[in-house]
């Protein structure tokens, strides 16, 4: 079902080359490297039957990529990477370069092993940002991502090292805040795996359109302290 869902959209759109990112992690959709390899093998076989060339990037799915979870918050991360902002999420930048590099190699634009550097050059010299702006203009123009009227931090209850993030519960938290139905709603992460955490410091900030959604999200966070595992 997953293979049909993913590939049918690509085939219907008329794609000839497809690069797919497969995040692997205990709370990701794909939990082991073996499962990722099996999925990519089956998907490759189906894709080849339709004349579709594929490549797979197996990535770390132990934690969310970037800081924002929710349409506008994720868009802010993307824009920060494209314009080269000093505080742009480095993990999102690296993931984007890996995938873009794979696209360049699969399409024959770059020799194998050189796609990453070609993608990095296009990002660093502004060509990627210029192309993104052109794509937006072709679809009606650039728009500033909306901001939610209500925000509230959720703080760590103890000090220590962040050792685990439950991706499924993080996703649930963002949905309770209103994402993705409310484009500005969601959460912003303030910590990454391996970070030192101080009790009382914010782990996430919840963004919501309505007081009820904000309350639902914060109540869920309070009832699920294992969203973030912190070891002393």
Show which residues each predicted segment covers:
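Well-ordered secondary-structure scaffolds
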Residues: 1-232
């Amino acid at each position: 079902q997953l293979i049909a869902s993913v590939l049918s959209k690509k085939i219907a759109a008329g794609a000839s080359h497809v690069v797919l990112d497969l995040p692997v992690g205990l709370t990701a959709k794909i939990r082991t490297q073996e499962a990722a390899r099996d999925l990519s093998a089956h998907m490759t076989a189906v894709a080849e039957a339709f004349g579709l060339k594929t490549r797979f990037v197996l990535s770390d799915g132990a934690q969310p990529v970037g800081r924002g979870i929710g349409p506008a918050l994720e868009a802010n991360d993307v824009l920060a990477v494209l314009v080269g902002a000093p505080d742009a999420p480095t993990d999102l930048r690296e993931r984007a370069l890996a995938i873009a590099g794979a696209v360049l190699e699969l399409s024959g634009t770059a020799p194998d092993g050189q796609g990453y550097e070609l993608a990095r050059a296009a990002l660093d010299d502004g060509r990627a940002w210029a192309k993104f702006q052109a794509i937006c203009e072709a679809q009606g123009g650039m728009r500033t991502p909306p901001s939610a009227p209500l925000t509230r931090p959720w703080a760590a209850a103890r000090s220590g090292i962040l050792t685990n993030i439950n991706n499924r519960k993080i996703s649930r938290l963002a949905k309770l805040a209103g994402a993705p139905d409310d484009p500005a709603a969601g959460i912003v992460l303030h910590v990454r795996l391996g970070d030192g955490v101080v009790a009382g410091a914010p782990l996430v900030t919840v963004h919501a359109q309505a007081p009820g959604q904000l309350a639902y999200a914060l109540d869920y966070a309070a009832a699920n302290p294992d969203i973030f595992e912190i070891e002393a």
